[in-house]
Amino acid sequence: MTRTSDKAPTQRQLRVGEEIRHALAEVFERGTVRDPAVAGVALTVTEVRISPDLRNATVFLVRLGGGPLDEVLTGLRKARAFLRREVAIRIHTKFVPDLRFESDPSFDYAEYINGLLHRPEVARDLGVPPSGEDDGDDEADDEDDDGGEEGPGAAAPPPADEGR
């Protein structure tokens, strides 16, 4: 009987993953990793996915400011034992999972989608002026600018005289 990876993570997996994420973020913030490929590089731990048995963890990273992450990942893989010890000091679990480091593709994908949404063809289809073009009007909506206020804070019109 094997578990499938389709299942959503349990609360325990999520909690332990967050603890590991915070612990690694603290280690990276302090700059205690001495590998030259990692030293001085600002990293963000975006997510930690942990296996159901809590023995393996995949750590997803992004380099702040962009740039290639290949050399940094190689350095982190070399420093895996050191990082595992640092995590063990900071979290209190029976076992500390084996750490695997990967680049987080979600930010690149979000940038790709954002680029698609800002293409002139898409803006035309949506009826939105393409970015960078301005109609020269700073008012959001000035079609009936009669000085009257509308909305929740506006005064109600006077009641009509009925029967007088």
Curated annotation (Swiss-Prot):
Q: Where do Pro residues bias regions lie?
A: 155-164
What cellular component terms from Gene Ontology apply here? cytosol
Please report any disulfide bonds recorded for this protein chain, giving both cysteine positions: none
Q: Check the record and name the Pfam families matching this protein.
A: RBFA
- Reading the lineage from the top rank, the first entry is Bacteria
Spans of biased composition, class Acidic residues?
132-149
- Give yes or no: UniProt keyword DNA repair: no
> Region Disordered: which residues?
123-164
Locations listed in the record: Cytoplasm
Q: Name one GO molecular function term.
A: ribosomal small subunit binding
Q: Name one GO biological process term.
A: maturation of SSU-rRNA
Sequence intervals crossing the membrane: none
Keyword Repeat present in the record's keywords: the answer is: no
Report keywords, A-Z.
Answer: Cytoplasm, Ribosome biogenesis
Q: Which InterPro entries match?
A: KH_dom-like_a/b (IPR015946), RbfA (IPR000238), RbfA_dom_sf (IPR023799)
- How does this protein assemble? Monomer. Binds 30S ribosomal subunits, but not 50S ribosomal subunits or 70S ribosomes.
Q: Which NCBIfam families match?
A: PRK00521.2-5, rbfA
Family statement drawn from the similarity comment of this UniProt entry: Belongs to the RbfA family.
Q: Which PANTHER family match?
A: RIBOSOME-BINDING FACTOR A, CHLOROPLASTIC-RELATED
- Role according to the record: One of several proteins that assist in the late maturation steps of the functional core of the 30S ribosomal subunit. Associates with free 30S ribosomal subunits (but not with 30S subunits that are part of 70S ribosomes or polysomes). Required for efficient processing of 16S rRNA. May interact with the 5'-terminal helix region of 16S rRNA.
Its name, as the record gives it, is Ribosome-binding factor A
Species of provenance: Rhodospirillum rubrum (strain ATCC 11170 / ATH 1.1.1 / DSM 467 / LMG 4362 / NCIMB 8255 / S1)
